[in-house]
Amino acid sequence: MSRRLIYVLNINRESTHKIQENEIYTYFSHCNIDHTSTELDFVVKNYDLNRRQPVTGYTALHCYLYNNYFTNDVLKILLNHGVDVTMKTSSGRMPVYILLTRCCNISHDVVIDMIDKDKNHLLHRDYSNLLLEYIKSRYMLLKEEDIDENIVSTLLDKGIDPNFKQDGYTALHYYYLCLAHVYKPGECRKPITIKKAKRIISLFIQHGANLNALDNCGNTPFHLYLSIEMCNNIHMTKMLLTFNPNFEICNNHGLTPILCYITSDYIQHDILVMLIHHYETNVGEMPIDERRIIVFEFIKTYSTRPADSITYLMNRFKNIDIYTRYEGKTLLHVACEYNNTHVIDYLIRINGDINALTDNNKHATQLIIDNKENSPYTINCLLYILRYIVDKNVIRSLVDQLPSLPIFDIKSFEKFISYCILLDDTFYNRHVRNRDSKTYRYAFSKYMSFDKYDGIITKCHKETILLKLSTVLDTTLYAVLRCHNSKKLRRYLTELKKYNNDKSFKIYSNIMNERYLNVYYKDMYVSKVYDKLFPVFTDKNCLLTLLPSEIIYEILYMLTINDLYNISYPPTKV
């Protein structure tokens, strides 16, 4: 901030011309005062600095503490010239309160000076909220200001109760919020080093602070810290765990600290692992209900490495599997409902049933459609799971809901329709029959014109005719793309590769590529596993030697790609 005088006090006046109150108010409230200036020297020697403004009750000291050009040097001069540090404003504000909650770049020395000038010291009830308000101001107002370790230490040493509550919060609640928001994206806050944060928390504990104090919502400071959307604050979290916060306290919503983290807007995989490990090491085995909630709630939340996290959770909590239900839904149902494609992929690879219904008879596709909050991703998620759906009734139900599906990406919508036409033989004919119906045509007006929709369907239909005319050994390309059995598709692998490069298929080339890659990787991993287990198959002491290699291949093809991959590359234990 540039040093610019807003107001210049006239000191060359006759002795009969006294300094007016409004002049002092303007001077101390708005001027960028130089502590060596003749104006300041003139004022402190010729004006009663403890004279109060009639309405606000401000003295010269109060005015200066609210000055945006505040400096410690000027404040020291005022303190040395007898300002009364115990006088309150009309609103009840003490000077030391204004200093700690309003001023920037405060010197520890001036805080000590001001406190020492008060004969009541800080044990008086007027000062009971001073420490809390000091830290709160750095959290809410002065976000770029540092929390001075020496000031915190002084306030605690002078007898301020660290467990004093205001609106349910203690000073530690606000300090933990400061620590969390330092790492929150978009926040412009001064960094807090881990060593300094640890020293300040240690100061609180040494002076009797309750690390597990509850606010009005039942949250401990650690609850609040974990509930804030954070980014890469692994080391800070690790430091806070050294104070061994209580992991079993539930807030008013029934959430423990770990569940607060799981239900926040952002999950860091390494922090999740760290929290669970700390719980099991220091508390013991986690209750089954909490384990179940952790896994199900995790799926609903954005995370940095969802595939790694769900794998870790499923391996860690052995009694949670693909059949486990919570509120009538399986893990796969929840993953579909919240468009978590990474988790969907993992659960299907470990044999999760995409066609299973919820307790109230809803299919996964219906859960995706019903979740309006995720409407921008509805088509893409439906498109993602269509490759796993074989129930024609489900496909037909999807087709019937096409007019109401939100369209945010026309290319994804075209691909979705191409899948529906491929998997539902009756789709095109039913569309043609209803083409002239005004009710049918009007249903599509919300997201796109009917003519555009009709054009997409016609284009897809023409290409399906071309698929039916394209022969692949003893069948057609149309039948191959509709087949989900990778063992049957294996014999068409070479032909699929050839058609995959055929430029005449513009719409179905992506589906061809998916089919080809699925079969290719399945065949590759079957061969890898067979080669790896070959010494076992050929061991004369093993009964498997009695089986022909064709039968062994049949057995291996019954496994999922995930199973085959784990046999080929055994996962390390977490």
UniProtKB/Swiss-Prot annotation:
SMART domains: ANK (SM00248). Keywords: ANK repeat, Repeat. ANK repeats lie at residues 56-87, 135-164, 167-213, 217-249, 253-285, 327-356. Signal peptide: none annotated. Residues 541-574 form the F-box domain. Coiled coil: none annotated. Belongs to the poxvirinae B18 protein family. This is Ankyrin repeat protein B19. It comes from Vaccinia virus (strain Western Reserve) (VACV).
